[in-house]
Amino acid sequence: QVVVPPAVEQGFISITVLKASGVSMDLDDFDRAGLFSEVRAKGLHEEIDAALLARRAAGDWKAFFRLAVEAKKNILISGATGSGKTSFSKGLIKLIPDHERILTIEDTRELVVPQRNRVHMMYAKDGKGLQKVGAKELLESALRMRPDRILLQELRDGTAFFY
């Protein structure tokens, strides 16, 4: 997977090498490898979800969002123009651990990501501009780039379906 300008920042190229595995395993192999040892009948994150609900009920929003970021929960931020959505996003991004691989998808470069393992991808809003790809195509590309997190700055039109 190679992403070059203008889909990424000028002066950067993102290269992700994917190697297909020649190994073919059956269920017994997966069992011996311990794949099923972490499977639970109920949700894997019951404790985290309960803690999030408790923080919400207590109105402890700072702790709520810290835990949500730590637990890699999807967070949707919405509001009117000028209401602070981007500023709030930047505050949450600071909570992401430094070792994680972060990909951003934006039509206008707004997000500041202090973590070093990051790729900023850009698309043309409404098909205008040098980039010939949209958010949907960049999202598909991002999934092949082994991200820990994908930060999609604006979600509009049918792209929401794919996210």
Predicted regions: what they are:
Residues Q1-E70:
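P-loop NTP-binding catalytic core
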Residues K62-A80, G91-Y163:
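Switch/coupling sub-region of P-loop NTPases
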Residues G84:
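Conserved glycine(s) of the Walker
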Residues S87:
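Conserved Walker
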